[in-house]
């Protein structure tokens, strides 16, 4: 899976499942999940679960705190690395 596809799917999760924006067009790759999108700790756990299910990868609780979930771009890099 290409990074663009991963990035687009993550943005879709943020809009369709977590309701953090009205449209994927409102979310830039550099958007900070906590600061810019207002995600709280429960949202981070929900996103980690969704990412694991959608991409078929293991996401540990420590991955959230290790900085992989700070922005859309960082999360895209994390998922891409786990897929390859």
Where are these regions (language model features)?
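Two-component histidine kinase catalytic core, primarily the HATPase_c
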Residues: 43
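Phosphopantetheine-dependent thiolation modules in NRPS/PKS and related acyl-activating systems
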Residues: 2-39, 49, 53-84
């Amino acid at each position: 899976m290409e990074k663009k596809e991963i990035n687009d799917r993550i943005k879709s999760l943020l809009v369709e499942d977590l309701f953090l924006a009205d449209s994927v067009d409102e979310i830039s790759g550099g958007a900070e999940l906590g600061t810019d999108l207002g995600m709280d700790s429960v949202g981070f756990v929900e996103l980690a679960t969704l990412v694991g299910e959608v991409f078929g990868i293991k996401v540990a609780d420590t991955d959230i705190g290790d900085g992989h979930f700070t922005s859309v771009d960082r999360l895209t890099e994390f998922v891409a690395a786990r897929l390859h």
